[in-house]
């Protein structure tokens, strides 16, 4: 049995739909008119959306204000749209025309992002009823949630990315930052060895102490082994084994 607590009913503004409106109101099922649904923002998502229209259905082809796309956005993942279109005999058309309308409805649902789309045409008093059922994919998230929610992993990745944002030194630096960035405190031990004092090492990228694999091409520490900040580093100037 369907849980109507998770169902929204959209009704076109015509007389037959007014009877349905009263019926669903007695069942305490939320209902909204087509014009109101298109005009206002829906803040809740539903497992099921019923869309009823009698006689008038041209609004379903409106590309500038696509109601099916908006329905898709207010459905939960794997939520179901049930579209019910009544066409009276006085509206004209034959079975071929009705089939064309059903096919177009399926295409519009597909273009709006629905899957598992099916349709059924039934005879009714003084007309026919076209039923189209479509499902909202579970791999799509609601548009409103995309702006407000993210997984813990995504938040962690964003935080890590922010840590990597650094203020680089300009090639033609005139403020003195470049000079400070390449400054190394050195103490000569002998003619073959120099000791580098890294406690006050300055770097624009912050990766210099990790080793050459992480250093930029102009790194002042290029060629030095990896070191810990504050560690005294000795470099063999002749590149001979110690």
Curated annotation (Swiss-Prot):
Belongs to the anamorsin family. Signal peptide: none annotated. Its main location: cytoplasm. InterPro entries: Anamorsin, CIAPIN1. It comes from Plasmodium vivax (strain Salvador I). A motif (Cx2C motif 1) lies at residues 205-208. This is Anamorsin homolog. Residues 148-159 have a biased composition (Basic and acidic residues). Residues 205-219 are annotated as: Fe-S binding site B. Residues 141-162 are annotated as: Linker. It is found in: Cytoplasm; Mitochondrion intermembrane space. Coiled coil: none annotated. GO terms for cellular component: mitochondrial intermembrane space. The keyword Iron applies. Residues 1-140 are annotated as: N-terminal SAM-like domain. Its cofactor is [4Fe-4S] cluster. Residues 140-159 are annotated as: Disordered. One of its GO terms (biological process) is iron-sulfur cluster assembly. Component of the cytosolic iron-sulfur (Fe-S) protein assembly (CIA) machinery. Required for the maturation of extramitochondrial Fe-S proteins. Part of an electron transfer chain functioning in an early step of cytosolic Fe-S biogenesis, facilitating the de novo assembly of a [4Fe-4S] cluster on the cytosolic Fe-S scaffold complex. Electrons are transferred from NADPH via a FAD- and FMN-containing diflavin oxidoreductase. It comes from the Eukaryota. The C-terminal domain binds 2 Fe-S clusters but is otherwise mostly in an intrinsically disordered conformation. The N-terminal domain has structural similarity with S-adenosyl-L-methionine-dependent methyltransferases, but does not bind S-adenosyl-L-methionine. It is required for correct assembly of the 2 Fe-S clusters. PANTHER family: ANAMORSIN.
């Amino acid at each position: 049995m369907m849980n109507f607590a998770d169902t929204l009913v959209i009704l076109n503004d015509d007389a037959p739909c007014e009877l349905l409106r009263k019926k669903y109101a007695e069942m305490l099922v939320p209902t909204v008119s087509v014009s109101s649904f298109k005009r206002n923002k829906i803040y809740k998502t539903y497992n099921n959306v019923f869309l009823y229209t009698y006689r008038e259905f041209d609004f379903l082809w409106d590309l500038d204000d696509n109601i099916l796309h908006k329905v898709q956005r207010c459905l939960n993942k794997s939520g179901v749209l049930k579209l019910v279109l009544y066409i009276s005999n006085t509206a004209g058309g034959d079975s071929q025309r009705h089939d064309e309308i059903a096919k177009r409805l399926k295409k519009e649902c597909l273009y709006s992002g629905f899957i598992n789309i099916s349709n059924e045409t039934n005879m009714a008093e003084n007309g026919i009823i076209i039923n189209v059922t479509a499902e909202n994919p579970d791999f799509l998230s609601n548009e409103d949630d995309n702006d407000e929610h993210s997984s813990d992993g995504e938040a962690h990745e964003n935080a890590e990315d922010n840590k990597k944002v650094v203020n680089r030194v300009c090639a033609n630096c005139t403020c003195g930052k470049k000079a400070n960035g390449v400054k190394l405190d050195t103490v000569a031990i002998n003619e073959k060895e120099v000791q580098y004092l890294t406690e006050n090492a300055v770097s624009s990228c912050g990766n210099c102490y990790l080793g050459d694999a992480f250093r930029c091409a102009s790194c002042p520490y290029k060629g030095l082994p990896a070191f810990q900040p504050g560690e005294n580093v000795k470099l063999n100037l002749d590149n001979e084994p110690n």
